[in-house]
Design a protein with these regions (language model features):
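Surface-exposed, charge/polar-rich loops and edge strands
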Residues: 1-285, 289-304
Length: 304
């Protein structure tokens, strides 16, 4: 497959840079795969397309304030997006980052808005050391302070590049799903941003089961495809977990003839990747078995 085969025209004025005033009021286009019928509706009416006995799987990941603005010792500003731990076996003091501006191994970066007087006693340091340059705008950095804490206190939400605007205080709430629980994503599972508690309740009243899994959206969401042959594009790894109870509910619904719905591509690729483990029942979070993907999926490839 060639990249040019996927080229299409998308006017910038058709890209929503801001959320609707009221969550859940976006439009919804539905395709009936059996008869090809297309329905123009609204997201709030999504329950109309479900039946009693179906299950909807949601991604409960939570977007972190992963964008940090820093300065070098000479005062030059450098922007970092904290992506993931250097390795899934390491602590949270060493991370892979995407950076903007020139940096080199050994550089010291200082988090903007950090004041030793104001923040004394909260953080040991707000200094970040560049350990290694990886190429493609990526680097390994380290800090004496847990980088997640630095992000939480001094970071901003890393909005997707296509929005072409800076984050605002409103994005802390609206660029987050209403059911977000597990911190770790650098981007929201977009299809879920329109979901509301009221819509979820309407699904439950119709007899639809709700299940959860976690996939932390990572570097791949920001990295462009730079090769002409799509098969040569290297996907980046993403951390995911599927609880045993979710796997069991999926099996039950499937056995009873119900349908399994994945809300968004993050859920779809996780279920596709773990399909065999779910239906072979090797996914059992209560067993502590090393075949339990909810425990050993910390380094699974995101190429699903």
């Amino acid at each position: 497959m060639e990249l040019k085969d996927y080229t299409y025209e998308l006017p910038e004025n058709k890209i929503a840079a801001h959320p609707p005033k009221i969550r859940g009021t976006s439009r919804l286009l539905a395709l009936n795969r059996k008869n090809g019928e297309i329905t123009d509706s609204f997201y709030k009416n999504i329950a109309d397309f479900f039946e009693n006995g179906d299950i909807l799987i949601l991604n409960d990941t939570k977007v972190i304030k992963a964008r940090l603005f820093t300065t070098k010792e000479n005062g030059a500003e450098r922007e970092l997006i904290i992506l993931e731990r250097h390795s899934f076996d390491s602590d949270w003091h060493k991370h892979k980052v995407m950076y903007r501006g020139k940096i080199k191994a050994g550089d010291k970066l200082f988090v903007k808005n950090y004041s030793p007087d104001k923040n004394n006693g909260i953080f040991e340091s707000a200094e970040i050391t560049v350990e290694e340059i990886l190429g493609d705008g990526l680097a390994i950095v380290s800090s004496k302070t847990d980088l997640r804490e630095l992000c939480e206190n001094f970071g901003t939400v890393p909005l997707p590049p296509y929005m072409r605007r800076d984050a605002t205080p409103l994005d802390i709430e609206r660029y987050q799903t209403v059911f977000a629980e597990e911190k770790g994503s650098v981007a929201a599972p977009t299809a879920s941003l329109n979901m509301t508690d009221e819509i979820l309740e309407s699904l439950k009243k119709k007899g639809v089961k709700i299940g959860y899994l976690t996939l932390h959206v990572g570097l791949g969401t920001f990295m462009p495809i730079r090769v002409e042959k799509i098969e040569e594009h290297q996907m980046h790894k993403e951390y995911f977990e599927i609880p045993a109870e979710t796997a069991e509910e999926i099996r039950k619904v499937h056995q009873n003839g119900g349908r399994v719905f994945a809300l968004g591509t993050t859920v779809a690729r996780t279920l596709e990747y773990a399909h065999n483990a779910i239906f072979e029942k090797s996914l059992n979070g209560n067993s502590g078995n090393r075949e339990d993907l909810s425990k050993v999926s910390k380094n699974q490839n995101g190429d699903l």
